[in-house]
Amino acid sequence: MTDKKEILVHDMSLRDGMHSVRHQFSLAQMIELSTALDEAGVPLIEVTHGDGLGGHSVNYGFAAHSDREYLEAVIPRMQQARVSALLLPGIGTVDDLRMAADCGVHCLRVATQCTEADVAEQHIGLSRKLGLDTVGFLMMAHMLPAEGLLEQARLMESYGANCVYMTDSAGYMLPEEVREKVSALREGLADETEVGFHGHHNLAMGVANSVAAVEAGAKRIDGSVAGFGAGAGNTPLEVFIAVCERMGICTGVDLGRIQDVAEDVALPMMDAPTRIDRDSLTLGYAGVYSSFLLHAKRAEANHGVPARDILVELGARRTVGGQEDMIEDVALEMSRARSASA
């Protein structure tokens, strides 16, 4: 690639990283990591419960603090970085959206299953009305062909989204698929509508897929310092920044500082270092929503069925985010079937 490109990188460690610590970030940890990212030059940082605004619940897990407390702790301390919040319609509400805007959130990302963009109309419309940088976020994008994904992206654009993301929530995609789908969005949306890519590292393709997305026209790329995130983590931001420097892609992030943030700040906060184990590898191989990993491990402990087997079955059933309750059902069903055949 010879053309000089400028992209906007978006750190997920304080939102997607919530999944890997059971949503238990303290306010002090939030402040420490966000200010370190800010000082490293990261321009956009996401802060909410792992499942977005309103995720603090029995179904998705109670966080150590409310979304408001996290946002109010982080936003006033930012020197150059802006803060985003994620909202999944059906989990987060318009009241949650207004609260985030009142706290000073700059960017709101409205996430839906890739076939259900129509449920985002109200939230995208309100976000634009409030003057926020408004992003449509199409999850589990491997489940739709490029033309279907473009149709859904156009809906989000028509509701007012100024950027639409193609989201590899399962870490399932390979670079050629990313290139094809990002190209379809870039060619099919208005020139002024930006395209973004969000990857997971379950098949170790996060960086390669993100590079493919940039080459295909993506302007925004998500990553997570030290890969802090669900499953085997998100695209490791410090690695992606290094690759961008090698390729002449401008991010505005200081490579040395972001390496230090990963090593000295993020890693000590992890319950265990993010890595590709057999269960997270299965997420990518079977195309399963990355945040299902800890739920599947708990189901394994409860029912004696290996998490890997549960995840494969969830993939075969084409489960999506929001169907966390099915994990226990599937595990119980498999346990009973094995007992009956014993």
UniProtKB/Swiss-Prot annotation:
Pfam families documented for this protein: DmpG_comm (PF07836), HMGL-like (PF00682)
Enzyme kind, highest EC tier: lyase
Reaction equation(s) it catalyzes: (S)-4-hydroxy-2-oxopentanoate = acetaldehyde + pyruvate
Keyword field: Aromatic hydrocarbons catabolism, Lyase, Manganese, Metal-binding
Every Pyruvate carboxyltransferase domain range: 7-259
Annotated site residue numbers, Transition state stabilizer: 15
GO biological processes: catabolic process; L-leucine biosynthetic process
EC number: 4.1.3.39
Active site per UniProt: 19 (proton acceptor)
Chain sites annotated for binding Mn(2+): 16, 198, 200
A single GO molecular function term of this UniProt record: 4-hydroxy-2-oxovalerate aldolase activity
Domain of life: Bacteria
Chain positions recorded as substrate binding sites: 15-16, 169, 198, 289
Family: Belongs to the 4-hydroxy-2-oxovalerate aldolase family.
Protein name: 4-hydroxy-2-oxovalerate aldolase
Biological source species: Alkalilimnicola ehrlichii (strain ATCC BAA-1101 / DSM 17681 / MLHE-1)
